[in-house]
């Protein structure tokens, strides 16, 4: 654990952002500017980040000011206010916000948004109005914000993930600005959740990364539903749809990854052990492919989903807040969370739940957790999923009729208007289910794109569209595929694999052209993984 301070010189006109408590104002000396930052809260040195570049601050124009809520308007929507009592802290001494009544009452902390000038207007429209509501939603659930301020920075297409959180700074890929506000809101909520789980509370053993990523994945749904002010029933429906999508993704991950990489607690009872020299070993830490895996996100999410089902969401979220109050500023192990959970809900022991059972069924084993199998039927019967299944049936019938009769008649717009409009996550599921259909006519793909305006949807939806384009060798939309590989590099790695596996000469030429064009700007890990796929 460490604190830090830094004085950074950079070319005049550039911007320096850092993991720092203060909003640094530069001083100038000729062609250079100097920026000074500091942190007083001890954190793992690995959380330190610095960004230097030519970005502009995104501020609300007059037409947007009405969309930026005031602290008072946000606080009125929060039904779970922080307790006025001050928790006792278990960490080393530092100026802790959890001991500060003013910090406790802050629904959202001061924030700034930065982006390349070319994305300023898009960030102003999509991202800026979401920051305060998402911060407030997080406060409603977990209480005191661990950090006094936050900068949100839009990073280039070559960034290796959709987002990353560090103390006082959140990095978001430009991909989150695609579509409307759904993907941006969800990812922003995920990174905000890391302020509590991943930063204020960290994993004592780095192999237990589910403590960070699984928790943030679980909380992103809760925060986003709160930020949207959804009813309890609407939030439940969204959660069921997301659970089904994550279950399908987890199945794919398990089928296409090594078993060793699927274990959430790979060191088991030896977790957090230190050698005589003081060193610890992080299993698979140098595996470049691991950073593109989502097992720890997904499986970790389902661990928490399982525990939530045992006690109910309201009680589970109250427990989360208690856990944060006790363990903020500390490094933890899985057993710390589970021990406090079993201590809080001791009646579960009589129902057969124990820490050992969670280890055996969830944390210490590869593959799909057996307790999950009972939940899948419930998810598929939810209203939002049934709507998608009905639309899939319509599209399959549309394709069959087209194959039989399209040579004699043209499809009219009346063939399309009967299709229902879908939410972004519903569109993702629709395209995934259509991907499982053996064949779809070119005309069906054409109308599918037109009806849902797939080129204007967010990157998650467009990724599934690209998978359909690859599978059916729909050459008309190869431009969509090239655009995706260039503009959404963190997500494009999966498409490179599918393009090569398809063994189509034209598609493989496309892969090589894109890689040659992009390789110099690619993230090194991504470049290595893609190069191994195609050469």
Residue ranges and their predicted role:
Residues 1-85, 227:
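Extended, low-hydrophobicity, Ser/Thr/Pro/Gly-biased non-transmembrane segments
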Residues 6-8, 16, 37, 50, ...:
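Generic structural hydrophobic/aromatic packing signal, biased to beta-strands
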Residues 26-32, 346-351, 419:
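Short, glycine- and charge-enriched coil/turn segments that flank and shape catalytic ligand pockets
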Residues 37, 85-105, 110-407:
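Hydrophobic alpha-helical and helix-loop surface patches within well-folded domains
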Residues 42, 176-177, 470:
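Hydrophobic pocket-lining residues within nucleotide cofactor-binding pockets
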Residues 52-79, 83-84, 96-112, 314-315, ...:
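Short, compositionally biased low-complexity segments
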Residues 293, 299, 316, 328-333, ...:
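Long, ordered, helix-rich scaffold segments
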